[in-house]
Structure formats: C-alpha cells, structure tokens
C-alpha cells in the first residue's frame, strides 16, 4: 500500500456527511434535492483538514444545530471521534435570511421573468452564497482548513439546517 504524506488530499477530505435529523425536520422536494446535491458534491470533491489531525483522515462529518450553535462533529472514517466544534449562528443569520429571500425571488422569477432578470437575480444569489462561504471559512479558521469550494458546499448544508432552525 502506498503511503501518502500528511496533508495529502486523499486523507484531508470528507468521505461521508450526515445531517442531524432533529435539526432539519421535514422539508419540501426542492430543499431535499438541494441537500442531496450538496452532500454528493461535497463528498466527491473537498479539502477538509481539522487542526491537529492533518493527514489523519479521511473524515466523516455530522452537522447539526444544538443549543443555538452550529455543530461540526468530526470523526475518522472508522468512527473514532476527532473533534466537535460549536460555532455561533449569529454571523450567519442575516446572510441566510438574505439568501432565502433571494432564492424565493429566483424561484418565482423562473416562472414569469425574462432571462435577463433571472440571470441578475441568480448573480445576486451567488454573491450572497459566496459571502456565506467566506464567513464560514473565517469561522473555521484555526479549527478546520477548508478550501473555498468546500466552504460553499458546507454553506449550502448550513442553509438546509437553518430552514427548520429559522421556522421556514
């Protein structure tokens, strides 16, 4: 078997993601579809290296909301606990609220608006998504190293958790 050095992308990655069912509750087909795509994309391609565990993966990730905090329960592939991080949801509340509002506008526009209007709304949606992704990267700094694309996919999952958490 070939040994890979610490920090190699084969070890610093997520191989499975679960969402806390109590955090997400029931949602419509659009949200379920977004969740499935985000999990698939995240597992297919990511960079995820918990501080102090660089090169010890691959890892599994369980996301949830507990005590009004975002929970990252990180384990090795065999289930051995690595670390659990609890992040305040406060920095994400406005971004997620704005994201939901623009997503509603986007889904409504798809039915009736011109292609130019739909494209403009989608650009705004992507901009807010990027802002949430950067905020997540900042909040994880010193805890878990992630690249921007991994942060984007994780932010999508955070919005799914907020869907129930915000009473949507």
Curated annotation (Swiss-Prot):
It comes from Bradyrhizobium sp. (strain BTAi1 / ATCC BAA-1182). This is UPF0262 protein BBta_0898. Pfam families: UPF0262 (PF06793). Coiled coil: none annotated. Belongs to the UPF0262 family. It comes from the Bacteria.
């Amino acid at each position: 078997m070939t040994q890979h050095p610490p920090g190699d992308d084969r070890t610093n990655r997520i191989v499975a993601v679960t969402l806390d069912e109590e955090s997400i509750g029931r949602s419509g087909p659009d949200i379920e579809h977004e969740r499935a795509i985000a999990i698939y994309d995240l597992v297919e391609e990511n960079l995820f290296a918990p501080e102090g565990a660089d090169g010890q993966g691959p890892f599994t990730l369980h996301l949830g909301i507990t005590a009004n905090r975002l929970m990252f329960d990180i384990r090795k592939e065999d289930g051995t606990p690595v670390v659990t991080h609890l992040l305040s949801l406060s920095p994400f509340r406005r971004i997620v609220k704005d994201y939901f509002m623009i997503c509603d506008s986007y889904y409504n526009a798809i039915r009736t608006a011109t292609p130019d209007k739909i494209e403009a709304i989608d650009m705004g949606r992507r901009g807010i998504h990027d802002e949430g992704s950067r905020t997540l990267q900042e909040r994880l700094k010193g805890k878990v190293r992630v690249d921007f694309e991994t942060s984007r996919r994780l932010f999508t999952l955070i919005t799914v958790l907020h869907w129930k958490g915000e009473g949507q």
